[in-house]
């Protein structure tokens, strides 16, 4: 009875937190693709979380996500719950997916079956996504319980046989990578054999890893950011302060499981976390152009004026970049979410004195750095605000 009372209180608190405000993440579609928002690493009561699978669906819908994969620990971590009598030894490791899929379908949320292989050092943790049967993966891994490296390889081999998309989780987790983020010997072998499709560059508990970002570029892996939450969403995210969970942005041809998989295989992903965007240059240029719309452009003898409108949940921080010293415009400014900024470009004589705009000029590009759009470790996106008559 005491446990039921505690659960009831938690549900009431959770409901009241959700009733406080809607914090839907708004990211516009980019040219040629739909921008889908997903979380591909999160836990429930079926491993070491304390949230029911259907609640994970409701949280995702409430926050405006399009994709969710519940990735409970399917092997070693689950034994704690077996020992405590919460689940049985022969528990179906696909249960979280089965419990959540009906509500997800009714809610328009794409639900992907997945799990987390959780081995001790030096193997680490790995997510298997788009799997058909987690039980078979566990069975293969647990044949080598006395050797974590062999267990990981066996589990991932079975996952790959099922057509899984495999993500190396939180390589910068201090417990497994004290003081320095490196590719360990086990991961080197797995990389060489082509087991990894992605790296979790941003983790809700560990934050951002610049090293992992650059590894994704070097080894042609998808750039992923996931919450890895174990408790209720409202206990992890300061919604009152305007925060949101970390999400992976998937640039897909349409909203479908098949299209999401195609986009992830093609590495068309990015991360939105802590008011930052992390990804590849190609996708981030498209995303910037979609987020910042240039409106009310006026050409005159003194130059160009316009309104820059931010139509996204991403605050955009801009600084002037080299290459257009013959024009004067703001060196540094921020366009908050869903707001506008008056922007002007004025010609300079000898890079110093204002002058009239040459009427023969038909095209101007104002070079900028987007300081919170990173295309590599500590490397902001360089692009331009373009004007053409």
Task: Give each language-model segment a name.
Residues 2, 20-39, 57, 124-132, ...:
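Charged catalytic cores and adjacent phosphate/nucleic-acid-binding surfaces used
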Residues 2-10:
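Sec-dependent signal peptide recognition
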Residues 5, 44, 71-75, 227, ...:
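Ser/Thr-centric signal marking residues that sit
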Residues 10-18:
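Hydrophobic h-region of N-terminal signal peptides that target proteins for export
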Residues 22-169, 185, 200-213:
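A metal-dependent hydrolase metal-coordination microenvironment
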Residues 46, 174-177:
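Short, small-residue-enriched loops and turns at beta-alpha junctions
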Residues 115-119, 172-175, 229-230:
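Short glycine-enriched loops at secondary-structure junctions
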């Amino acid at each position: 009875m005491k446990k039921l009372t505690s659960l009831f209180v938690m549900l009431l608190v959770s409901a009241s937190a959700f009733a406080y405000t809607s914090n839907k993440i708004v990211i516009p579609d980019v040219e040629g693709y739909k921008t889908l928002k997903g979380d591909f690493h999160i836990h429930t009561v079926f491993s070491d979380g304390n949230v029911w699978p259907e609640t994970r669906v409701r949280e995702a819908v409430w926050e405006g996500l399009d994709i969710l994969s519940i990735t409970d620990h399917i092997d070693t971590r689950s034994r704690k719950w077996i020992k405590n009598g919460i689940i049985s030894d022969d528990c179906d490791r696909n249960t979280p997916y089965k419990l959540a899929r009906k509500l997800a379908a009714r809610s328009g949320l794409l639900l992907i079956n997945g799990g987390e292989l959780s081995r001790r050092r030096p193997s680490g943790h790995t997510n298997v996504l788009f799997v058909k049967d987690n039980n078979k993966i566990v069975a293969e891994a647990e044949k080598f319980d006395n050797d974590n490296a062999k267990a990981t390889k066996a589990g991932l081999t079975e996952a790959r046989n099922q057509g899984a998309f495999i993500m190396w989780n939180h390589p910068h987790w201090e417990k497994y990578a004290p003081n320095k983020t490196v590719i360990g010997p086990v991961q080197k072998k797995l990389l060489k054999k082509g087991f990894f499709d992605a790296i979790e560059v941003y983790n809700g508990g560990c934050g951002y890893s610049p090293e992992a970002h650059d590894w994704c570029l070097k080894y042609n892996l998808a750039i992923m950011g996931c919450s890895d939450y174990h408790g209720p969403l409202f206990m992890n995210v300061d919604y009152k302060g305007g925060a949101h969970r970390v999400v992976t942005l998937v640039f897909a041809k349409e909203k479908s499981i098949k299209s999401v998989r195609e986009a992830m295989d093609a590495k068309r992903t990015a991360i939105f976390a802590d008011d930052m965007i992390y990804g590849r240059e190609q996708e981030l240029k498209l995303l910037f152009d979609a987020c910042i719309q240039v409106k009310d452009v006026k050409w005159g003898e003194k130059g160009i004026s316009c309104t820059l409108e931010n139509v996204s949940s991403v605050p955009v921080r801009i600084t002037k970049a080299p290459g257009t010293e013959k024009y004067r415009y703001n060196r540094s400014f921020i366009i908050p979410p869903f707001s506008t900024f008056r922007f002007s470009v004025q010609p300079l004589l000898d890079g110093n004195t204002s002058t009239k705009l040459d009427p023969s000029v038909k095209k101007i590009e104002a070079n900028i750095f987007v300081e919170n759009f990173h295309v590599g470790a500590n490397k902001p996106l360089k692009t331009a605000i373009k004007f053409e008559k």
